[in-house]
């Protein structure tokens, strides 16, 4: 008999020892045992995100995190430039529309990656854009977009950059 495993969305294997850890009693967030664990997790997350700032931890899906970021940072009526190059990019465009953001949709052939060269002319055309929303690795196609060049562009322009890094986190550079 081989090892058994549980597979979750996108065929992510969950090792049995992780499943067993989930069966242990939880530590209440107001107990004296919780702060040291939380602080250690914050240190590790800051290192993973290359950040000196605290990292927000959300209990939800990747979609909930990107949607929360968009809704928290972009008000209805404000302009957002959103890359649609796959299923998740398509989702961020729908989120922008659902919340009444002024959407500039960048349609790119699925399977093609982009970088700053795609967004530079758009920022000149839409200098009032509050943010650019990009999926770093489009899971539906496997394409990795050049986040470093896009981030450099947004730093120069003062435009916010919201990155869906769900499938790229710890696999692709964040700096």
Predicted features and spans:
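A glycine-/small-polar-enriched, mobile loop at the entrance of the PLP active site in fold-type I
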Residues: 6-59, 63
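Conserved PLP-enzyme active-site core in the AAT-like
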Residues: 40-41, 57, 63-175
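Charged, compositionally biased N-terminal leader segments and the immediate start
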Residues: 1-5
């Amino acid at each position: 008999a081989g090892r058994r495993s549980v597979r979750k969305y996108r065929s992510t294997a969950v090792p049995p020892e992780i499943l067993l850890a989930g069966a242990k009693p939880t530590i209440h967030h107001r107990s004296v045992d919780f702060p040291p664990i939380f602080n250690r997790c914050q240190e590790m997350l800051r290192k993973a995100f290359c950040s000196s700032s605290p990292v927000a931890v959300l209990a939800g899906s990747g979609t909930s995190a990107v949607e929360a970021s968009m809704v928290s940072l972009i008000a209805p009526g404000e302009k957002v430039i959103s890359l649609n190059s796959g299923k998740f990019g398509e989702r961020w465009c729908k989120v922008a529309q659902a919340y009444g953001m002024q959407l500039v949709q960048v349609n790119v052939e699925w399977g093609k990656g982009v970088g700053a060269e795609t967004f530079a002319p758009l920022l000149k055309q839409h200098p009032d854009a509050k943010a650019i929303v990009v999926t770093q690795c489009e899971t539906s196609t496997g394409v990795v977009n050049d986040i470093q060049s896009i981030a450099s562009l947004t730093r120069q322009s003062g435009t916010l950059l919201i990155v869906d890094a769900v499938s790229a986190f710890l696999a692709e550079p964040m700096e």
